Every structure is written in structure tokens, then in C-alpha cells.
Amino acid sequence: MSLFSLPSDFRTYCKNKGYYFILGDDAYINAVNDSTVYENNKIIVIADLSFKPNIDNNRPYSVTYSGTIAIGRKRESETDDGITTETVSSLDETFEQKYDNRLQDLSELLMVILSDFACSNDIELNSVNARFDINKFDLNADFVAAQITLTK
């Protein structure tokens, strides 16, 4: 892993785990989501990162990445191109039901993914500040999103 390869290394990590991975800002992510048919219960990982090289004697010795990493799952009952997705959600679902049905599991998975990726790639996970993003994007999927800081 080079100092500047964290986004591509994270993409490879996610794809090797079988997750959908999207790198970019909200507008780009929304456009990708609009044109993607997600399989039932597949995990969607979103990353929107910026970086700051740490420099000594005019040379970068490490890079600090910050931004958002979000984990979600599209789970509504519909068939598109022969793929049916199903869910335990409904339009009148309370926040507590969303938490019990999806958000708790996604919260735990987010931390597992971040910790595993950091440990496997000699990265320091400096901070994680997570939130619940309900009905995110035109996709209307629920995500657990974290503002993160990582140093390589």
C-alpha cells in the first residue's frame, strides 16, 4: 500500500468481501445508485474522502485521510431485471424498528470493516463519529455513516 492508495485499497477490500463500493461525493453516489440494481441484502459501502499529506523536510511521510464512510443495505420488495429484493421494513416503520431491523447490525458491521481494514493495512484509525442516515439518496436506503480520520 502506497501513501496515496488508501481509496483504491479500500475499494479492493470491499469488493473482495462481496460489498458494492462507491467512491465519490453525494451527487455522484446518487447517480450511481439510480443506475444500479442491488441484490437482496447486499451491503453498500460508500466513501467520500479527502487527504492531507504530512510533510517533513519537503517530503510526505504519512497521509491523513478524513471524510465519510457509510454502510447501508437496500431491502425493499421489488423485482427489477429479474432480481427481487425484500425487506422487513415498511413506510410507517418507527426509528426504533429501523434500529432493531437494520441499523444496529449495520453499526456493528461498520466498526468491523473499519477495524479489519485498518489492521490489515497498517493504518491508524484515529477517530470515528457515526450517525444514522435514514432514507438516504433517491435509493431510500438506511445507512450508518461515520466521519472518520485514518492515517497511513
Please place each PLM-identified region on the residue numbering.
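Acidic-leaning, charged glycine-interspersed low-complexity segments
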Residues: 12-13, 22, 40-42, 96-151
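Short, cysteine-centered beta-strand-loop-beta hairpins and adjacent loop/turn segments enriched
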Residues: 54-57, 72-81
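A solvent-exposed, charged loop/short amphipathic helix patch at secondary-structure junctions
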Residues: 77-100
